[in-house]
């Protein structure tokens, strides 16, 4: 609208002060103003050109490929949910995996969806009936420890889901509330199911998983539903959290997380977010796709750049470090080389996220590659410093 007003005003000015007839004045004004969008396109074309870049599709697929068949993966935000849905709904990628967004899991309509079949994914193992989770019912359960002892997870969930008034009364509080009478819960691990989910590697497997709720005022509906799934599932289906999920959604299960790629698998051992090198190596080296960020000339905006640098740290460096600790130096070197191949410095500049890359190269005896990385980091930092010093105080 304002551009149109500007053209009209310029035409009027030419007509009045240039003594031009209306047709010529309008034509001249139009031609002159055409240079404005041409200039805008010329200056902004490069940083709006997404040709050759398929990061959203491929990175979304990578989350799904981090999971075992028939898995459940919990996500939280838009960027770790919508790309996964696109990959499944449009590209048909890993439709056996059920994506469950914890933000939506606070609503009854979404829980209804999760209890239905979706493609090859069976309904989620949720035992709560609709009248027990309908909106306005059990939206939260307060953590009110009436005992210092830990109680069984199943007992705690049955306590919350009961409609018996005696389970709603807290000493000293007149109002009836949904609550959990302990801040320490435990889940008994079925040894057969636990061994199966660990692939027969039972070293370190625990007989019960402790869930410490100390410091939490309440559990939301989504957390109660996740705990119900943990109890009901009995490790029949692999359960994962996307690595981008906020820790406050973990229900304090992160001590039992094992990284397999872009996801943490819930396992019956004190993994503490350690890397499962076998699974993660296979995913990173053989299954993951890179969205074209490895191609010369592909424009990478600040959001994609941030994700790529996170990949460098959370995937490649972490996996290589774990492989070095296990004495698998050849594989660690392959991982580092893969990192430099798919996240080339021309597209993803070297900065603090590459420090560990250089250190690991040095540990592996690749001093020239290490020096090249450290030199690249230093050069980029000096360019930044010089640019800052050009600014007036």
PLM feature spans:
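ER/secretory pathway lumenal C-terminal domains and tails of membrane proteins involved
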Residues: 1-70, 87-393
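Phosphate- and divalent-cation-binding pockets in alpha/beta enzyme and binding domains
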Residues: 82-86
